[in-house]
């Protein structure tokens, strides 16, 4: 949903710790699929989350390097501040840039990795294959591209939540998202551009107390800028989603990891 909009933490200290442990566990599960990446030059594409960067840095170690590509310049600045307190092994460099036109030298990295990039990708002007091609261009020959993302292989409240977020953004900015779909769509995307593609589908990873955090959120301020009819529709859908969360909890989606090798 529209996360981090609640005024006060609705969780106790113990509940907050359990929630954060589950987030770390989910991150670790996804990063473990990369295998041994010690000493590699790695690009993390499409984000500046300290949780993911810290996990990658620790796996890469002091003999490797990590660059993170983030489109939002404000998030780059915030990420730089947060990383000062992170437990890093490999040095991390944050770069502002677009995955369609990464401001990086070609043939630079041993591995390009993304988590959640494609379902948030705005394909209004350029396509998902163009994004994957651009990312592969900065990988050395015989290097690897690996992506993790949500798929709709199991029913989940999260799917409705993500769709509602995307619709609000579309109403505000006109963005068109690649979105969440079947595992086959992502596998086919990678097979068209990479060699020796392999993949793994992982079951949903529950996050304790996530439902309570979402139910505690305030109404997004962005709703006020919508036309009255669109705003009313969005509020009604948000309320229906909240009722579903109260009844079902915040059930999460499965994730798909796909990787392939670059050859030229």
What residue spans do the PLM features occupy?
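Conserved Class I S-adenosyl-L-methionine
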Residues: 196-264
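Class I SAM-dependent methyltransferase Rossmann-like catalytic core
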Residues: 1-25
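Conserved alpha-helix/loop element of class I SAM-dependent methyltransferases that forms part
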Residues: 19-40, 55
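Short alpha-helix
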Residues: 178-193
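A short acidic, Gly/Pro-enriched loop at the edge of an enzyme's catalytic core
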Residues: 100-112
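Conserved class I S-adenosyl-L-methionine
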Residues: 146-168
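Class I SAM-dependent methyltransferase SAM/SAH-binding core
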Residues: 43-44, 48-101
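A short, conserved alpha-helix within the catalytic core of class I
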Residues: 121-134
